[in-house]
Every structure is written in structure tokens, then in C-alpha cells.
Amino acid sequence: MMACCLRNKRRMKGKLSWKSKKRDLSHSGNWAPEDDNDEGKIVFFGGSNYTFDLDDLLAASAEILGKGAHVTTYKVAVEDTATVVVKRLEEVVVGRREFEQQMEIVGRIRHDNVAELKAYYYSKIDKLAVYSYYSQGNLFEMLHGKLSFCIPLSMLLWYAVSKTNNSTFAGESQVPLDWESRLRIAIGAARGLAIIHEADDGKFVHGNIKSSNIFTNSKCYGCICDLGLTHITKSLPQTTLRSSGYHAPEITDTRKSTQFSDVYSFGVVLLELLTGKSPASPLSLDENMDLASWIRSVVSKEWTGEVFDNELMMQMGIEEELVEMLQIGLACVALKPQDRPHITHIVKLIQDIPTNFNL
């Protein structure tokens, strides 16, 4: 894919510089010998009409959307009319060449159900990925609520370096979702994951499927973001893997995620859509019982109706559809990887759910 490179030839005056000596370089990741003379550049993918550079990003108005273990996410308004999502990557464990190769694979993926990678930036000190912005927020926010706040991006970037608390910001912006909305999100996200798995000659893996990485596009279908980041950043701590509720039981290193484990994570998202429960929330007296285990336990007692979100149960005539989706979700979270369905089969199963909605 054709790309346009804009080199960072000047530093900001009076604002935090990417090259600031105050910055902590200990989390900059592996630094390959070929990187020594690279001062950093923004690479835009073909078809992008953006003209901003690094200084424009730093000076732009920004809103922090969340902070994960190795990624801090910002909503950034540039060029007056353009709004993008900027992800600042920490604990990057690959050199420039491998980083760029991964970004090029992601940058070639163009689909309505996959968030578009607009550009990336790589230097010795900082690594950024610039994605499309989705105004409706992510699925986690819709189901469980979340609060974000607005301060200048340069201050946020400095704050992110020293911040050690990996928790998200809780709020009350929960959005009621009817069954049609949840079904559209599920179908779209399944299609997006199928496209992702086709990339790199059918070998590509997302590695971090979860509701906070699923947005809705202009047609209200699910759209997957954050692809390409898992394999270039340090693996999540074991405590985070287990407590998140999304990762397959066989995964002990997120950099070694597989398409089978992606399907497991997607299955958890389906169960989250059906129950309205966060996979990370306590679900029983047993602290080790995650969402998938809790649902298996309830279903085994033939109390299937108890698992569904009360908001869904108030809708008439959708019980059979809910049960069919539940069966798909449970198939995805099979304990043995080889027992999980292929994502293309999952797409067909969801599309074949009989419904009165025009999807």
C-alpha cells in the first residue's frame, strides 16, 4: 500500500516535546540498531486526506478515552473538522521494522466492520497508532457505562507515562440496547473478525477481542478496533488475563494468541450482550467463576432464562432468538480450542437466526 511519510523536523516550543529529556524511556520497548538514526515519522496510509503532523497532534484538543495495561487511548480533534483516535503504545517489544510490518498488514484491511488504521508514528521514545473515530462509543460503555474527561493531549501524554493505575474510568453513561441493536452489533463484529482472520494469508490474529474494542459504525453494526497491537506489545500480566474474563483458558501469553482464542473471546462478548453483565464483575460466591463458567452452571441446572438481561426479557417474542445466540456463544467458549467453531461458521450461524428485524 502506498504511504506518505511526514518527518518530524521541528520540536514544539513551550509544550511537552516527544523528545523531552524528562520522559521515562524505560518503557519504550526494544530498540533495534537500525532505529538509531530514526527521529520519528508519521506514516499515512493511501487514501487518507489528512495533512497533520506530530506537532499538530500534540497541540490538538484531546480527550482521554481509557488506559489499558500498555495502551492509552485519546480522542483528538485536528484540522478543525477531523477527529481521530490516537493510541499511545507502551511496552512495545519489537523494533521499527517489525512494528512497521505489523502496521502495514493492518493498514491494508478495509472493511465496514473493522476500524480503519489511518496512520502510525514510530520513534525511539514514542509509538502511536491513529484510527477512525466512532462517535457512539464502545460496546462496554453502552452496556455498563463509562465516564471520560477532556484536557490537552500534551498533558495527557505526560500523565500517561507516570500513571500506574490500569483501571478504566467508571461512569453512568450506559445506553439501553434492545435486541435488534445487540444483534446488529454481534453480526457486524463477527464479520469484522472474519475479515481480520483472513489477513496475512489467513494467519492474522487479533489477540484482544473484548467489548471495549467493539464500536458501532454508521449503520449501527459492530466494528472491531485495536487489531495489530497485541503482538507488538508486552504480554498482559497473568492476573489481568484471568481477571478480564475475555481470554481463553489456554492463553498464558497474549503475544501467542490464536484464532481459536479470538473465537473464545468473541464468545464472551456474545454472552456479555445476552446477559448485560461485565465478564470482569463477580458473578457468584466463587471468585474463580467467570462469565462463561457462570452461564454454563446456570444452563446445566435448566435455568436458562435466568441468564438473560432484564432489558431483553421485557421484549416480547425474542426468546427463541436469545436461546439460539446463547448456544452460539457457548460453542465459542468451549474449553478445548479445537471444539470451537471457525469464525466464518459463526457469522453464518448468527445470520441464520430467524428474526423479524430487517438486518
From Swiss-Prot:
For this UniProt record, give its keywords in alphabetical order, as a comma-separated list.
ATP-binding, Nucleotide-binding
**In this entry, which stretches build a coiled coil?**
none
Q: Name one GO molecular function term.
A: ATP binding
* Record PROSITE patterns: PROTEIN_KINASE_DOM
* The Protein kinase domain, residue ranges: 59-357
Q: What PANTHER family does the record tag this protein with?
A: OS05G0588300 PROTEIN, PROTEIN KINASE DOMAIN-CONTAINING PROTEIN
Instruction: Give the domain note.
Output: The protein kinase domain is predicted to be catalytically inactive. Lacks the conserved Asp active site at position 208, which is replaced by an Asn residue.
User: For ATP, which residues are the binding ones?
Assistant: L65, G66, K67, G68, A69, H70, V71, T72, T73, K87
Q: Does the record's keyword annotation contain Cell membrane?
A: no
What domain of life is recorded for the organism? Eukaryota
Q: Which family does it belong to?
A: Belongs to the protein kinase superfamily. Ser/Thr protein kinase family.
**InterPro entries, sorted:** At_inactive_RLKs, Kinase-like_dom_sf, Prot_kinase_dom, Ser-Thr/Tyr_kinase_cat_dom
**Any Pfam family matching the protein:** PK_Tyr_Ser-Thr
- Name of the protein: Probably inactive receptor-like protein kinase At5g41680
